[in-house]
């Protein structure tokens, strides 16, 4: 399948440690990735951009469950699919209420959190909502923290972000 070739390129050729993926093709579309047991796989669940609601907030019916937003269905499915304990979710830091709901569904799953910093996600709310198993991404706030994009300034901004994260735990 195409996803088998994507997974092979990502993990075997390029030697990535983790990847974000789209699960809209269902379980068959993520199996080629999850079979790499030492690699992290993060399913897009609730992205940080405003128009994520166009699809991710739509109510869906799956099996015998009552209608619920697609992001909750993805969270429930990710538990079923996490056979190798290498699956996580992408949940935007711009939606801490959604993060709280998803954390209730998946209490121990790793969550990649984009949207902190330039996109307006609140770091304090995000960490206080879910203090454990978060991987917080604040790329633009770190790389473009000052006009001088030197390694020293990037390192300084990364250390500052790390200190802020730890202060809210």
Residue ranges and their predicted role:
Residues 89, 93-137, 141-142:
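A C-terminal functional module that forms or caps the active site or interfaces directly
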Residues 7, 30, 75, 99, ...:
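Generic structural signal for well-ordered alpha-helices
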Residues 27, 65-68, 72, 96, ...:
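Electropositive phosphate-/nucleotide-binding environments in soluble metabolic enzymes
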Residues 124-133, 138, 144-169:
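C-terminal helical cap(s) of enzyme catalytic domains, especially alpha/beta-barrels
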Residues 28-30, 50-55, 97-101, 120-121, ...:
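Short acidic/glycine-rich loop or secondary-structure boundary segments that cap or lie
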Residues 1-90:
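Conserved anion-binding
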Residues 22-23, 49-52, 76, 80, ...:
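Short C-terminal domain-edge/linker segments immediately following a structured domain
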Residues 34-36, 79-82, 100-106, 158, ...:
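Surface-exposed amphipathic alpha-helices with a cationic face
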